[in-house]
Structure formats: structure tokens, C-alpha cells
Amino acid sequence: MNSRIHVIHGDITTVAVDAIVNAANPSLMGGGGVDGAIHRAAGPELLEACMTVRRQQGECPPGHAVITAAGRLPAKAVIHTVGPIWRGGEHNEAQLLHDAYLNSLNLALANGYQSIAFPAISTGVYGYPRAAAAEIAVNTISEFITRRASPEQIYFVCYDEETTRLYQRLLTQQGDQ
């Protein structure tokens, strides 16, 4: 099962997959962290696409996802999802984070994408504890792919060594069950 899930230490903006996931803010207008990096690398086309989505449906609430073209990125599309802001764990954060991953996967599936790359959603300025967020990510994706043939390849693209090791350890433990 886990042969479809991979961990990469690197820059998500350089990964050549069908879709990359952007840990966006509700405005979809770019920001800090991975969101800002994706917007900078994609160029003005991405901001224009996000503005079109905003005009059509307004902001993207936590747990939801929308899809746009990828601009100058090597990916075909960007799936923008909004993870929850960590507020101590008593405000439905786990469910919202699960939904962010699940809705991103469903958009990839609906668009026929066979490969998708995820950052560690909500673990930057949104403050979600890394280990808890990684467990939700791995469990959500593993459960999704056990029932579906697509996407064929899923990548967790981790910006730092500590997060990379965390995802590798979780996937190894899951493979042992």
C-alpha cells in the first residue's frame, strides 16, 4: 500500500507532478511560507487564477479546496486547501485538517490526476503540532488510497529534515501493521 506514498525533502515548487497542494489562506491571495513560495514560483498567472476563483465563490474556508492552473510551476495544477489554525485542539482542528487532505485528494481524482504532492498543511504559521498533523495526513491519505487506484503516486514534500524524518517514521510504522 505505501509503495504509492513517498517522502521528499525539498522544495514543492520544483516537484514535477500532476498537482501540487498549496497550504493556502482563505483569501487565496498568497501569503507566507509555502503559500508565498508557490505564488512566487508560479508567477502572476496563479494570482490571476486565484482572483477568478475568489470572484466566483468568495473565500475558501478551512477544510475546503479549490483548483487552478499552475502558472510557471512544473505541475499541471495547484490545489489550494485551507488548513485549520491550531487553537489548542478543541475547535474541530483535526477534522478540518483531515478534510483539507481529503478534499484535495478528491479534486485530484475528479480531474484525473495520477500524481499529487502535499506540503505539511497547517504546520507553519497556523501552528498545528507537527507530529499530530503528520499522523492525520498519513492516515487520511492511506485510507483514501486503499479504496482507489488513483492517484497512483502521492508525495509528502517536506521543507526540513525533522519533518522529513517524521513522515518517514510514520509511513514505516504503518507498513509494519
UniProtKB/Swiss-Prot annotation:
Protein name: O-acetyl-ADP-ribose deacetylase
Natural source organism: Citrobacter rodentium (strain ICC168)
Alphabetized PANTHER family for the sequence: GANGLIOSIDE INDUCED DIFFERENTIATION ASSOCIATED PROTEIN 2-RELATED, MACRO DOMAIN-CONTAINING PROTEIN
Enzymatic reactions: 3''-O-acetyl-ADP-D-ribose + H2O = ADP-D-ribose + acetate + H(+); 2''-O-acetyl-ADP-D-ribose + H2O = ADP-D-ribose + acetate + H(+)
GO terms of biological process kind: purine nucleoside metabolic process
Entry keyword set: Hydrolase
GO MF, any single term: O-acetyl-ADP-ribose deacetylase activity
Subunit structure: Homodimer. Interacts with RNase III.
